[in-house]
Amino acid sequence: NFIIMRVISGIYKRRRFDVPRSFKARPTTDFAKENLFNVLSNNYFDFEDGVTALDLFAGTGSISIELVSRGCDRVISVEKDPQHLAFISQVMREVKTDKCFPIRAEVFRFIEKCSEQFDFIFADPPYALKDLKSIPTRIFESGILKEDGLLVLEHGKENHFEEDPHFIERRAYGSVNFSFFRATVPATEQ
């Protein structure tokens, strides 16, 4: 018994992958993912322009494969569940890419130890994660987001980040919410 994970756009457009229903992680819905990437492509990135990305709490790798499909230069997928990580690795082998690097790690430890910087960081923690509110602060304090980079945090509607000094916008698609953050917020967006 499976859940279908689809690639929305790019070189792997329309590719489908069967995610076992036994997985705790669920792929971001097609509706939310398509809208998120429309916003990213129209307002923030040309993913084919050497973009490096970090996918935290990567789950099924739905965002990672979408980033690779759209032309990201390098994607690191961080996931602590060994089954989920094996699934991400299998998907990347199936599409024969060398652009994605799945890493088994606890996300907060990874953030502390990582010395690389990224143009784009996506985090999709479990909505009930007790430290969810601390994620933007941890990322900005660690220095892993480039100065002109973008952080997108997926969360439930009960979480609000508007008071965060790095917050720039929030998008909601059904029950899925995305908050956007930048290291340096332009004066027009404050």
Residue ranges and their predicted role:
Residues N1-Q190:
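Class I S-adenosyl-L-methionine-dependent methyltransferase catalytic core
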